[in-house]
Amino acid sequence: MSNPFAHLVEPLDPAQPGKKFFNLNKLEDSRYGSLPFSIRVLLEAAIRNCDQFLVKKNDVENILNWKVMQHKNIEVPFKPARVILQDFTGVPAVVDFAAMRDAVKKLGGNPEKINPICPADLVIDHSIQVDFNRRADSLKKNQDLEFERNKERFEFLKWGSQAFHNMRIIPPGSGIIHQVNLEYLARVVFDQDGYYYPDSLVGTDSHTTMIDGLGVLGWGVGGIEAEAVMLGQPISMVLPQVIGYRLVGNPHPLVTSTDIVLTITKHLRQVGVVGKFVEFFGPGVAQLSIADRATIANMCPEYGATAAFFPVDEVSIKYLVQTGRDKEKVKHIKQYLQAVGMFRDFSDSSQDPDFAQVVELDLKTVVPCCSGPKRPQDKVAVSDMKKDFESCLGAKQGFKGFQVAPDHHNDHKTFIYNNSKFTLAHGSVVIAAITSCTNTSNPSVMLGAGLLAKKAVDAGLSVKPYIKTSLSPGSGVVTYYLRESGVMPYLSQLGFDVVGYGCMTCIGNSGPLPEAVVEAIVQGDLVAVGVLSGNRNFEGRVHPNTRANYLASPPLVIAYAIAGTIRIDFEKEPLGVNAKGQQVFLKDIWPTRDEIQAVERQYVIPGMFKEVYQKIETVNESWNALAAPSDKLYCWNPKSTYIKSPPFFEDLTLDLQPPKSIVDAYVLLNLGDSVTTDHISPAGNIARNSPAARYLTNRGLTPREFNSYGSRRGNDAIMARGTFANIRLLNKFLNKQAPQTIHLPSGEILDVFDAAERYQQAGLPLIVLAGKEYGSGSSRDWAAKGPFLLGIRAVLAESYERIHRSNLVGMGVIPLEYLPGENADTLGLTGRERYTISIPETLKPRMKVQIKLDTGKTFQAVMRFDTDVELTYFHNGGILNYMIRKMTK
């Protein structure tokens, strides 16, 4: 079918008639000029891809009529220009593709039809752990261990890059996916097949939104959805409301981009932006560098929006030149965006589009702050940190409470480390990590940390040796400018050696703490602290022994490491006392903004980016030496504990079955609010007494070889055993934190996997009860695949985080939502009832279904299949089954 909008096509430059674009101004529709810039990107993609099948003319009209339709809950298709994956989510995607090829072959189709149509980049950044720190060879040793642990996964990924077209792999050691995307992969404008069009993407990592800081529309999706996009399917999304976030004023000289983003995170959580786009505008935006904008856009999942968009302006264009992009390409990028009405001047208010709602922040009101101790939205001013931590100590167990009895607030424990005596107390810092895509891509905060380290060393300060310090930059570029500017030796002297290029501590790959430290924490029952420049600090994520974790800017991470405790008021108390007996305060060593900018201007230069990135795909010799099979179908190794053919498609036929009601289901878990995907499917270490550990031990592995759950995502047997295996899981059946539940027929307390297995052996269906924001956090597809394998047919919750709900749909698990004002408490549900959920043969989006209990009580819930496309996936038993049937016909 030809495109009904073909008449909009014209050359961008008459001198190059072969280079065309869809000129949206030729629509001659006054509504276009008042659309938010983010919605203009959706509109262009719909017009360019309009085939009257996947994308219909009516979809284009709905997007153009955004001002009215944003309130109508209507779905629109979106075909992004590309996909990015990281290795933890990328391995299961390639496993699924390999298994889908097998399934298509088995059903009589051509397996090579399973191939990415949409270009995909897979960046390996999640595997490296902080095993070695505080030594010059930490990086080399951690990278060697990474290869030793992950050889089989890496070989499999290398096979995938050869077996599938359109899939590029960025080897380990290159940097963090979002920074590599910002500095290297992002096109801003595509120039492909004779057409210019806006760069846009979805990624299998929730912090994909970082790229919105450069004016590239992108957000995180579940791995399952990303696979469908790679196979040419559009994403089906509800046309979002767009909140205009107006920035005015100039930030105070002592304030960092981290302080601004933590302030915005708290503010937008209060405004309520889940499922919406946020678009930044106003004169304050022009004051922010691309690194600052990217930091703000990065934490979009923490404030709950789908995307946090900064349209392209002159600052974006300068950044492209600064990062070594081709000057001719940059010229065409600006020319195209101006021609199509997508280039922004933030000082010109006549360009301000319509928004659903406008909120404002005056940057001069931002103060230095941290967030914690358990959630990124719980912002605390640095001046209040001591007082806030001490009130959390005694407060009842919760997001801001540890329930330590008042007479134990000053407990402490002495221990011996490296033949010296030290003391730990509540609030002692045991992990200090400069880590994560949020901050390590920002030269101003990284150089700020380096200059602070230099001044601290010059003033005679040091960091206690038992504190686990680490620096994991987002790319080789960071190391380059830290080294060239001369601050690296000072960072090393304080223990902040480069330990690897990857997510590391931010995703729980913090590695072990010294045994003496763990012993002191456990014996003293102490609330020990991790301070990190990360973006998430949910319980049990950073390290099992740090009950309090605070997000802070890189300079503050160093400051708290030097202080050794969170219980310090920097204004009144010294950071430390030097050998001369002089007290040194934080204000004495805090670098000024002018100092930082002078160093940044001198050392962050285009040549550096070119040098790092021109050899990115070949620089890792260990990767180059890996052997990988060349077959188009993967030859599964039955002995492998990393890569296993999943059971998802074993019984798949070409015929569709009508939907079945769920009869007499038991509740596997009865959960509360804010259950994260970390609770459902942890990414960190495999506990020695867990079902997954027993599985690995039975196959002859020692605990040293267990690796992490994240690295085992290519093996469904381990991931099923790791489902709900987080030690911080709070199940109302037990009233304590444990990865366990009650097997209701027998009354026994079992590990969640063992209980689920028992129910499945008896042929009994399962559901999960939950509260608000079920599935918040990382875009973890195993948080939907795992429950599916445990036999969970439905989840009944008060509300869902966007990505997780669509992942459940993608696996054929029914997301049910209580009616407004109702929940387990108001309905008097204990979770010990048996549930029958009536599912009619004819389904409609967001329809209500009847739930009947064995007590005789009945109530209704909303079936959260939000679009017709989602219902199609459900009828097929999930999105991948749908794709296999489609590719086989």
Curated annotation (Swiss-Prot):
Reaction(s) catalysed by this chain's protein: citrate = D-threo-isocitrate
GO cellular component, one term: mitochondrion
Gene Ontology biological process terms from the UniProt entry: citrate metabolic process; intracellular iron ion homeostasis; response to iron(II) ion; tricarboxylic acid cycle
Cofactor(s) listed: [4Fe-4S] cluster
Localization of this protein: Cytoplasm, Cytosol
GO molecular function: 3 iron, 4 sulfur cluster binding; 4 iron, 4 sulfur cluster binding; aconitate hydratase activity; ferrous iron binding; iron-responsive element binding
EC number: 4.2.1.3
Keywords noted in UniProt: 4Fe-4S, Cytoplasm, Iron, Iron-sulfur, Lyase, Metal-binding, RNA-binding, Tricarboxylic acid cycle
Chain sites annotated for binding substrate: Q86, D205, S206, H207, R536, R541, R699, S779, R780
Listed InterPro entries: AcnA_IRP_Swivel, Acnase/IPM_dHydase_lsu_aba_1/3, Acoase/IPM_deHydtase_lsu_aba, Aconitase/3IPM_dehydase_swvl, Aconitase/IRP2, Aconitase_4Fe-4S_BS, Aconitase_4Fe-4S_dom, AconitaseA/IPMdHydase_ssu_swvl
Cofactor note: Binds 1 [4Fe-4S] cluster per subunit.
One Pfam short name: Aconitase
Tree of life domain: Eukaryota
Binding site for [4Fe-4S] cluster: C437, C503, C506
Protein family (similarity comment): Belongs to the aconitase/IPM isomerase family.
Function text: Bifunctional iron sensor that switches between 2 activities depending on iron availability. Iron deprivation, promotes its mRNA binding activity through which it regulates the expression of genes involved in iron uptake, sequestration and utilization. Binds to iron-responsive elements (IRES) in the untranslated region of target mRNAs preventing for instance the translation of ferritin and aminolevulinic acid synthase and stabilizing the transferrin receptor mRNA. Conversely, when cellular iron levels are high, binds a 4Fe-4S cluster which precludes RNA binding activity and promotes the aconitase activity, the isomerization of citrate to isocitrate via cis-aconitate.
Oligomer and partners: Interacts (when associated with the 4Fe-4S) with FBXL5. Interacts with frataxin(81-210).
Record-given protein name: Cytoplasmic aconitate hydratase
